[in-house]
Amino acid sequence: MPHFVLDCSESILETHSEEQILEQVHMVANSTQLFKEGDIKVRVNPYKKYLVGNKKEDFIHVFANIMEGRSVEQKADLSKMMVQKLADMFPEIPNIAMNIREFEKATYCNRSMIKD
């Protein structure tokens, strides 16, 4: 972790490739120094069918899932940096947003934590 999942309208991929988007989201997350670089995971989910305010209007929304322990200020700065980078990349897209969800260390589990 952390996981950065970017939902977007498929048409934004005409401006920048998925690879470019993945790289830039990773770069912003890494630049905060809140996470180990090797732990950062990024995915892009382009949608063909969607509505924004009952209109087919391009959008980008980043969902960040991170382990608890960062301050509100750190999380707010991460969101602002990410939205700014995406706004710079996609100046024509009016709907760019991000939210951060924290999960508890006590309830998190991954395969490497399971004893054989």
Language-model segments: what does each one mean?
Residues P2-D116:
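A domain-level signal for the structural core that forms small-molecule/cofactor-binding pockets
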